[in-house]
Swiss-Prot record:
The lineage of its organism: Eukaryota, Metazoa, Chordata, Craniata, Vertebrata. This is T-complex protein 11-like X-linked protein 2. Residues 1-36 are annotated as: Disordered. The gene is TCP11X2. Belongs to the TCP11 family. One of its GO terms (cellular component) is sperm flagellum. It holds the Pfam family Tcp11.
Amino acid sequence: MPKTEETVLQNDPSVAENGAPEPKTPGQSQKSKSFCLDDQSPDLIETVNEVSKLSISHEIVVNQDFYVEETILPPNSVEGRFAEAMYNAFWNHLKEQLLSTPPDFTCALELLKDVKETLLSLLLPWQNRLRNEIEEALDTDLLKQEAEHGALDVPHLSNYILNLMALLCAPVRDEAIQKLETIRDPVQLLRGILRVLGLMKMDMVNYTIQSFRPYLQEHSIQYEQAKFQELLDKQPSLLDYTTKWLTKAATDITTLCPSSPDSPSSSCSMACSLPSGAGNNSEPPSPTMVLYQGYLNLLLWDLENVEFPETLLMDRIRLQELAFQLHQLTVLASVLLVARSFSGEVLFRSPEFVDRLKCTTKALTEEFISRPEETMLSVSEQVSQEVHQGLKDMGLTTLSSENTASLLGQLQNITKKENCIRSIVDQWIRFFLKCCLLHGMQESLLHFPGGLILIEKELAELGWKFLNLMHHNQQVFGPYYAEILKHIIHPAQAQETDVEPN
């Protein structure tokens, strides 16, 4: 069969066997790759299709950068070599057919049929005249009759198709079509036409996504609720993991004091005062506080734990990415605080120095999770050099050998999870995220923890992502959460505060 341009959904490497983009539920098991729907019941197939639709709609709404993009298998990979061999075999077979006496147009007719369907799919609803023209010029029965009489003019049809493509394509494809016009070999020309048509289909899909995004955003909550309810009706146990997740959150919030001597700052603590008696362990927590505790727990989720709440499965990959960013910011802020404590405030009043130190630390801590000791050894040495050079450039007293050794030791000690500075920074960051959930981003920024001021920009960006994602989830699944929480916390308290976003 001809090679069609492979495309994938951004942030999702899954591709269906026929080359069409297929959504994949985050957290999907690798074993599912061998799962064959053809052998399953119609109800299961319908459920999978509904989940796919829901996943794509959700992705478009919450991911502003969502689009379909071209992907090419690595040429040296087994998959890449196999695919290339199969495609070459097809095109060589087509060439043999066209060069035979008399010419065999079997494969050519199939290709022209595919080209016709693709061209028609690129038309807008009101382009009826052009639609009729394509139907007539590429009429399958007529082309078949011409082929039977050996009169099928492939070069002429290819030129006609190129003219249509030039008319329908986005400006970004003009150059590719101009290159096709210089190809004289009919087989290579057909191959190029199909490749560029695949890109044009991708462009049309992205245009459609962009056009429909405002509509989807306006109706996404009702749509996702309706689709999820349909799935819940078919599978009543669909909220089992969600119930476990909220139960654990309720336990956590009643056993952990919401504020402690190590809490960020008094101003931030006051801004994030906990409603509905959540600050008193003798009182049951409100549904909203339990839900927000559950959201924060997602950033600590064990990757080996498969019991991920069903209502957040579509955001699992995003939450994992946010958890990774949170971890990176914790290490970054810890490094900056230690470095500032040794070098003094004067050096850290230089934006150029702070930015340079942040860039260096970010680059070196990319592999902190997999190689913490080696990473922090490199970080400590580089930061020590930066501090020494920075103090020297500003005409300040450089660190003594003793202080340098102490700086290196404290930086390397950040590797340990129980490190005092790292633990406090982690508390500050999570407390800030709780502030964002409770009171919104603007108020939280007004009471930003002083100890995190060096990463204010990065943490605000993380907070926005987390807040927007959880806000959308709360709007969609709030009614389900409220119903579950009625059975987890005291009924009177459950009715006191609805699970609605602030």
